[in-house]
Structures are given as C-alpha cells and as structure tokens.
Amino acid sequence: MDEEAAKPRDSTVNQQHQYYYGTFQGVANFPTPTPPPQFMQPQHPITTFPGHAYQNLQGHGGGVNYAQGFPVVVPDYTVVEVRPMIEHELPCCGLGMGWFLFIMGFLFGGIPWYLGAFIVLVTSVDHREKAGYVACSIASVVYLIAVMLGMTGDINIW
C-alpha cells in the first residue's frame, strides 16, 4: 500500500507538461508576451480532480484562467427577435398561376403555355410561382418544335 501511495496518479501527473488549449497558440520559436504588471495574477498550483473532464488548465501558452472554464455569455451580442414574415397564399389552390397555366396548356392546346412564357419574360413574378412559369416557357418551346416537325412530316422531299 505504501508503494501505491507514493506513485503519482494519472490525474496529478506533472502539470508542466499539460498545455493550454486555445484557438491561437502563437509561433513556436517566439516567446509568449507577459501580461502587464497590474494584471498579473498569483500563480496557484493547479489541482485536478479525476472525475472532471473539462478543466481550464493554463500552460506555457498563456491565456486567461476563468474560474469555471470558458465564459458563457458573449459580450456585445444582441439577440433580435422579429415576427416571422407571413406571405400571402398562392392562387389556384396554392399552386400558383404558373402551374395552373402549365396544366391548362394540356387541355387547351398550348395557348396557356405561351401566355405563361409571356408573363415570365415581361413581368416580375413571385419567386414561388417562377418555377411554374419557367415550365410554361419550356413547354411552349417544345410545343412549337413539335408543331413545326408535325407540319413538315407530310412533305416527302426524297
């Protein structure tokens, strides 16, 4: 029992080898600056406890030794709480006019697709409805190509 009491425990190993962990440690070949004399704190031996995992140990890297670790409150940080912005509902059962014109284009032979392409090119639309209008403009181009190829399909040049 005397031999075990004489051996140092894992948590009380030489405190000179435990380094301060911070975000900036400085350059290895440049000595750390000493704090001004009015801010010098007396060096107390750092005692460690085996059950506590997070301790603020100050080694050769310097730094501020807080009593309970790192500070919890960040100074000069204001929290601004605002009400959430409420957007209006989209027309046509929440789909928006763009997707409504896209669906109606299948029923009315592509004319609503040209209307949707005209709207997206000329006016400023809601960002939520823009996908439907872009789908209308793509469908109008595909419809135009299909009609042109369909019209030339009956002519035999060969």
Swiss-Prot record:
It comes from the Eukaryota. Keywords: Ribonucleoprotein, Ribosomal protein. One of its GO terms (cellular component) is ribosome. The keyword Acetylation does not apply. Belongs to the eukaryotic ribosomal protein eL20 family. This is Large ribosomal subunit protein eL20z. It comes from Arabidopsis thaliana.
